[in-house]
């Protein structure tokens, strides 16, 4: 079981206590800059040491989705947004098998090597993975779904992938709509639990909204996905329609409207944890104005990048690889080579006009040495 948050009394269900801290507080507490390489390659879970190689199959057996030449399956859920787009995508099957213990046991005093924090291919992806993981325990707890990732202990529904954007959270997998309905519509068992009721339907998904009117909150439930919107600043139903429409092919997708984004996804979007942005350039005034961004690529070397996709893939119990793709106005190849994948080995950085690609590898031995320095 994960440790209690600081300054909180011991409680067996501390994730579900009413005065739960903000996502930012918890990210800081769990060490948001702890890298996936550190989480996975140091003290890897026993599950990761099975004979079966983790992450070797791109086919998702749980929900039947398969990455195609047109892009990874999660990309179908990313609608064309006239503003900007940020996302975090997690192959939960792989991450759960490999690093679930490390995700839960991360401590605030974990020493993270400075070179990891300074590497755009490591820190942002790691923060994204933790954000997606913690969203379920934090944000979904208010709907009675806070333990959805707990390996069948509380739910018959199973999770294969997680997708987070600033407006929405998508749980992909084998979902039992009746089970979710029972949780959402149940009489609240605690003060902080919000009761919902079925009020609408969108393209085969049953839509639930709070019994007590709350702007910006709606949950769509289907047998292959659970789509959550909980942001009072948006029209929740419109957001659901846009995202479900993209997934069903009845609304425009970001990948279809942007050649640079499609290229970046094809190049670097196939990892076990993937983050990306399309829109406000990294380091721009528009990006700086948003102090709570989902994806943080605020590195001087990436200033002016309008499209970025970065991913980490778990190859086995000892090795992770990273892939990076960006479209940057007037990129500085020397400066980029100093940071992209610099904390790993087998580093490669290539600049072709405005297109930048990079790859690197992180091995258990290298990570262990870095943490001792």
Language-model features: locations:
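Soluble, non-membrane globular domain cores that form compact, hydrophobic packing
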Residues: 2-167, 172-373
